[in-house]
Design a protein with these regions (language model features):
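Condensing-enzyme catalytic core mediating Claisen C-C bond formation in acyl metabolism
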Residues: 100-158, 260-326, 330, 334, ...
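Acidic-glycine-rich active-site phosphate/pyrophosphate-binding loop
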Residues: 136-144, 195-209, 246-255, 307-310, ...
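Glycine/charged-rich beta-loop-alpha catalytic/anionic-binding loops adjacent to active sites
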Residues: 149-150, 182-185, 205-219, 255-261, ...
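Phosphopantetheine-dependent thiolation modules in NRPS/PKS and related acyl-activating systems
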Residues: 2-103
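Conserved beta-ketoacyl condensing-enzyme motif
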Residues: 115, 157-222, 342-363
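Short beta-strand segments
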Residues: 116-119, 189, 219, 244-250, ...
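Flexible, glycine-rich active-site loops centered on histidine and acidic residues
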Residues: 237-270
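Claisen-condensing/thiolase-fold acyl-transfer catalytic domains that form or cleave C-C bonds
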Residues: 162, 166, 192-193, 210-212, ...
């Protein structure tokens, strides 16, 4: 006699509760059905993987992880996956040799890496500049009047680099109409995520990406996203990957907090993340492709900013703001001029400049010196603060969204330019796949 459906469903709930109890803290109540257990902090990503493995074994559903894909880490998602029509049967012995999960025909891309999807995530709190000034003991109006900061985005509760990265990634996957199982490589950058496993490994675990999907965490601080793009493009051009996820995520406000650093420095920063799906696809009228990239390091400015741990929970900070501001404007201007030469795209024909934005005043100065409208610089630092490696990413998200809404023939190139402590620098061009315009 078959088991009634309601009893079967009850048994599944009992299995889920049993597996959750193994991973939750002893005094933790049973979570709500829709609660994302990783984002709420009830479980870390490795514990969630443990829950999935336990349920797979107890319910005899060996492909549960694949079914969940990018679903939330919730009881409701587990039940939906378990009760789906494609209920797995016990594994049967394989008589044929399976090919590796990543096996497939060689990738022929002519060096092309196309952006299929993009996403962003910001700290959920919007903190006005006057509140930040008060917290740091700054003179009223200092951040707004001298730096141009109107507000900063700040994480709260369980939010962290990992959560922000996951939210941005889900948005990018959705836009790209892709699944975690499609990814061949994850490239992640963060200047604030410390410890092990690395942020890339945690994100791989959260996405339930396949075990043949590589992970690489890259550095460069505020230049990290461009470093990630360069690596992704190389992997795709070499035929080593078809789809690559590039993610940036930084939470500054917990480390650069009042009492740890001066407000003139710490008050400039916010929290955010960005994500991009790059693919070895043939360019279509709706897509953008990675073009020319340049990198370097102005080592003469290596001592202009130094950040490290100090006693008593404080941060050891050396920050020559005046020298860095002069160097930043000059270097960003040179990067853009060099990109013009290499790409044969005039700055007047650029749709947006997704640059690093240490502060809004510096962006305004750069726009004046370049003689381009300030409107071509997406608004990030003014309302979010300096997002570190995600500043360029959030700016590029905005630029791509605006350009994607235009007819294909009206879309314009996007210039990237960023700086990192050291003084690391880099730039790149994102080309639309619409018919090329003759250079001026």
């Amino acid at each position: 006699m078959s088991i009634p459906k309601q009893i079967d469903a009850l048994r599944l709930r009992q299995i889920i509760e049993f597996c959750l109890r193994r991973e939750l803290a002893p005094d933790h109540p049973l979570p709500r059905m829709e609660e994302d257990l990783v984002e709420s902090g009830a479980l870390d990503s490795m514990a969630w993987v443990g829950v999935i493995g336990c349920v797979e074994a107890a319910a005899n559903v060996p492909d549960l992880g694949a079914r969940l894909a990018d679903s939330p880490a919730s009881i409701a998602a587990l039940l939906a996956a378990l009760e789906s029509p494609a209920r797995a049967r016990p594994k049967q012995p394989q008589k044929t040799t399976r090919k590796p999960a990543a096996a497939g025909p060689p990738v022929h891309t002519d060096g092309q890496a196309v952006i299929l999807g993009w996403g962003e995530a910001l700290g959920s709190q919007v903190i006005p500049a006057d509140q930040v000034e008060s917290e740091f003991g700054l003179t009223p109006g200092k951040l707004r009047d001298r730096a141009g900061i109107e507000s900063v985005r700040r994480v709260t509760g369980p939010e962290n680099e990992f959560n922000l990265a996951a939210v941005a990634t889900r948005a990018a996957l959705k836009r790209a109409r892709a699944k975690p199982a499609d990814l061949d490589f994850l490239i992640v950058t963060s200047e604030t995520s410390l410890g092990y496993p690395s942020l890339g490994a945690q994100l791989h675990s959260r996405l339930l990406a396949r075990d043949t999907c590589g992970v690489l965490d890259v550095g460069g601080a505020c230049l990290g996203l461009l470093n990630g793009f360069a690596v992704a493009r190389s992997l795709i051009a070499a035929g080593s990957a078809r789809k690559v996820l590039v993610v940036s995520a930084d939470v500054h406000t917990r480390q650069l907090a009042p009492g740890r650093v001066p407000g003139e420095f710490g008050g400039l920063f916010g929290d955010g993340a960005s994500a991009f799906i790059l693919a070895a696809s043939s360019p279509s009228p709706a897509s953008y492709r990675l073009g020319e990239f340049i990198f370097g390091c102005a080592g003469a400015y290596a001592g202009a900013i130094r950040v490290g741990p100090a006693g008593g929970g404080r941060v050891d900070l050396h920050f020559d703001g005046e020298a860095l501001s002069r160097a930043a404007v000059s270097r960003l201007e040179r990067i853009i001029a060099d990109l013009e030469t290499r790409s044969r795209v005039n700055r007047d024909d650029v749709g947006a400049f997704a640059t690093h934005q240490p502060n809004p005043r510096l962006v305004e100065l750069l726009a004046r010196r370049m003689d381009v409208p300030i409107e071509k610089f997406p608004t990030v630092a003014r309302i979010c603060g300096n997002l570190g490696s995600s500043t360029c990413g959030v700016a590029l998200n905005q630029a791509l969204t605006v350009q994607a809404a235009l007819p294909a023939a009206a879309r314009l190139p996007i210039f990237l330019a960023s700086l990192g402590p050291g003084l690391l620098w880099g730039g790149g061009v994102i080309h639309p796949s619409s018919p090329e315009r003759p250079p001026r």
